[in-house]
Amino acid sequence: MKQEPHRQSEEKEKPKGPMAVEREQHTSLSSGTTVTASTGDESTNSRPVESSQTEKSLSLRIRILKQLGFDDIQELNACDTGLVEQFLNVRLINDTKELEKIRESNLAKLNQIIDKCMESDKISDSTLNKILDMSMNRDTNNDNNNHLTIPSPITTKKRKINASELASPRGHRRYRSDIPTVSEVETGVGYPQIHQQPGAYTLPMPANQWMSNPYMQPPQPQVQQIMPQYLYPPGMGPQAQLPTMSSNSESQTPVMSSQFLSLNQHGLYQQNIGAHPVMSMGPQANIYGQQHQLQPGQERDQSRKSFSHRRSQSANISMANFRSPMRNPQPASSQRPVNFLIHTPKHPPPT
């Protein structure tokens, strides 16, 4: 019996939980409605302000278009700001053109009036000068008073003659017309025209004229140095007397083709007089036409002589017989192959 009232008390307490939840939900919903109501009020307040601004801008654009002369504004898009700006620029350009036309007509009328005054005898020169001075003074006063002027795209592009350099940040810039020009005749400076002058081409000289020219002949040695013979290989030592160009026969004169004359027409022996002849040229190169020259078959027979060792054959070098006219030896000089091999007891010299 004691447990029943306890159960009844629990049953009475159970419905209190969901009721409390419902109350909490009701309070939260009520608070949410208040918040949404406040945000809605702000949006409704901002929308009329924006709409009023757009309406004002549209009304201004419509008025401007009407003043420009557009009656059918419904066909145009008044909301487009760039379109209205373009119409305004066109109107300004047209106004400036009309002003220039009026100015030109006024100047033409003034010229006609001045011509008539000059032709008439009643008006003297003093009165004309006074009228011109008065007009000049009025122009200067008007320029000083009229500070606010409408800029036109035509007048702004013209260069100001008396413009100050401090007015713009680029004060150091100069115009081409301001730079004084100096002619080449005044300064006395002449520039050579290299590309316009044709180059002169001279044909190569023949062999007879080349050899007869005294300036082309090599200098004759005056002092002969006596050197020991052991420094030179056999047949290569200095000769006792060098023949001159006049003592040589006609066979010793260089018989050369046009190719060699065109390349060496400034003198063959001026560059390297004391140098040795080139060793890469074979014995068949008969440039100077020597009389005592061996045939290729005879030289091959001499080079194929039987030697005692194979190593000595690779070291033997036969010197060429052709030489320059200045270093031409006596015809009775016999040469033999020079051996550059270093002989050792293991490799004795050939016998």
From Swiss-Prot:
Reported induction: Expressed periodically during cell division. Regulated by the SBF complex which is one critical regulator of the start of the cell cycle.
Recorded family membership: Belongs to the POG1 family.
Major subcellular site: nucleus
Organism the protein comes from: Saccharomyces cerevisiae (strain ATCC 204508 / S288c) (Baker's yeast)
Compartments where located: Nucleus
GO molecular function, one term: RNA polymerase II cis-regulatory region sequence-specific DNA binding
Compositional bias ranges of the Basic and acidic residues kind: 1-26
GO biological process: cell division; positive regulation of transcription by RNA polymerase II; re-entry into mitotic cell cycle after pheromone arrest; sporulation resulting in formation of a cellular spore
Domain of life according to the entry: Eukaryota
Keywords: Activator, Cell cycle, Cell division, Mitosis, Nucleus, Phosphoprotein, Stress response, Transcription, Transcription regulation
Protein name as catalogued: Transcriptional activator POG1
Post-translational modification: Phosphorylated by CDC28.
Role description: Transcriptional activator which promotes cell cycle recovery with CLN2, after pheromone induced G1 arrest, probably inhibiting the ability of STE20 to activate the pheromone response pathway. Binds the promoters of genes that function in cell cycle regulation, cytoskeletal organization, and spindle assembly. May also be involved in stress-resistance.
Phosphoserine sites (modified residues): 152, 168, 314
GO cellular component: chromatin; nucleus
Additional information: Present with 736 molecules/cell in log phase SD medium.
Compositionally biased residues, Polar residues: 27-56, 241-256
Lineage: Eukaryota, Fungi, Dikarya, Ascomycota, Saccharomycotina
Region (Disordered), start-end ranges: 1-56, 234-256, 291-351
